[in-house]
Amino acid sequence: MFRWFLLCYFFGKPIRSETAVVTWRLFVEMKLDTPWAILEASERQLVAVLHEGGYTRYQHVTARGLHVCMDRLVREYEGSLYFMLESSLDETEFSKRLQKLHGIGPKVAEIFTRETTEVFARRVE
């Protein structure tokens, strides 16, 4: 679930979608695919990966934003999007919680939550 979230995070930035995918793949290859791994990486390390992925602007802002987003996710939800989802009453609440994370707006939350509809549907059964 986190890898999908990370890709959605990149899709929400003012970059080409191809750049978002390349950057996401680099994060996965470099084992920067958990909130804790991103928090442990220095801003300089994140900037280098973002640059390698094709970011020509906003690398520092994005690196800092990732740190802020991951810090809150770890502090409030033990680093688990699944925990956030399970503690939400419905998709609307889940979307609102996502949007409290730095860098997550309504569109990113909408893209991400498309993949969680099934979880909420199972609760009703």
Task: Annotate each PLM feature.
Residues F10, L89-E125:
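Catalytic DNA-binding helix-loop module of base-excision-repair DNA glycosylases/AP lyases
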Residues G12-V22, L73-G79, E118-F120:
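Short helix-capping/linker segments at secondary-structure and domain boundaries
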Residues R3-K13:
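Short, hydrophobic/amphipathic alpha-helical patches that form generic packing surfaces
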Residues W4, E18-V21, T92:
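A generic alpha-helix surface/boundary motif
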Residues L32-H102:
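Alpha-helical ds-nucleic-acid-binding substructure associated with the helix-hairpin-helix region
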Residues S17-F27, H60-C69:
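Non-catalytic DNA-binding core/recognition domains of DNA-processing enzymes
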Residues Y9, L26-E29:
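Amphipathic alpha-helical segments that form the core helices of the histone-fold
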Residues E29, Y55, T117-E118:
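Residue-level marker of structural boundaries
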